[in-house]
């Protein structure tokens, strides 16, 4: 499994959580960090952010020379439209037969993370079109679908409707 996420130095999220879980499940995991943050973006102000976009394609190029393919590619935090486009390329390069899983990390509690422009959900929706499995929270789902965010609790019918609309993305 290739896990493509950020590394948040503080906070229970991103690669620092995904890698131990996958490893404990006996799954060999390769990591590809998209950014390094001093903390995650939820609830912290003044965090540092180092974008690793410039490193992603050279890493992918090296893997391509080694004919590395993955059984699954799992994405989390992607920090830009450019990273979304690069990951689409990586789906083709390293995962033609792979299960493609996208967690469109970009929002919580009805709010897009401050780091992202208002139109970012449309870019993330374009990546979800290429995925076999998408795992948004309710905020992310409604943003990608262009629907208003509604506070829970949620009915079974509401969740089913959201899921059907997400499935129609691709």
Indicate where each model-derived feature is located:
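Conserved N-terminal subdomain of the carbohydrate kinase-like
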Residues: 1-102, 106-114
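Conserved phosphate/ATP/ADP-binding segment of small-molecule kinases
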Residues: 114-170
